[in-house]
């Protein structure tokens, strides 16, 4: 819950301006793909945003920094409820990408369950293997999307930019290139179609040959 009391969470989730501020910073793709955060990022690669709202019982508006994944998880599933020990569940990312905000990739769990779930989702070939660290990886993906949009890129071109940014921090010796066998070894659930992944992999090969991956 990030130290935010339930009453304030209710106000934040009900406030149209708060919802709009969160949603405007999410780049959405297909139903099963990662939806990436385009705003500020924590050192762990999670999205964050400052919101201002007044709770029903509060005399003055509150200004709080909110975890984007916690906000969107609760928006889609309802308020997090405390565990038997009084602690609140964590929001984990089944895809292994902390900046992903696709609600179907988010799940409630404990710290141990979060780590196990990330490994089970295949993040050891993605975020966990990235030499840039979680924040560096998330920033690279965010900046690739923002730059592609600013350049007027098509959704397909943006998908190529995302894949290239995602694999650029993974040492080539640890990465199996995804053609001709498809995209099964690309990070998490953030795989594009085979053609897009092959284009991204081709870009990685070119960069590796030029010594620009490290």
Each predicted region: which residue ranges?
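Short helix-coil boundary/hinge micro-motifs
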Residues: 1-66, 86, 95-98, 159-163, ...
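Short, cationic Gly/His-enriched loop motifs
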Residues: 62-189
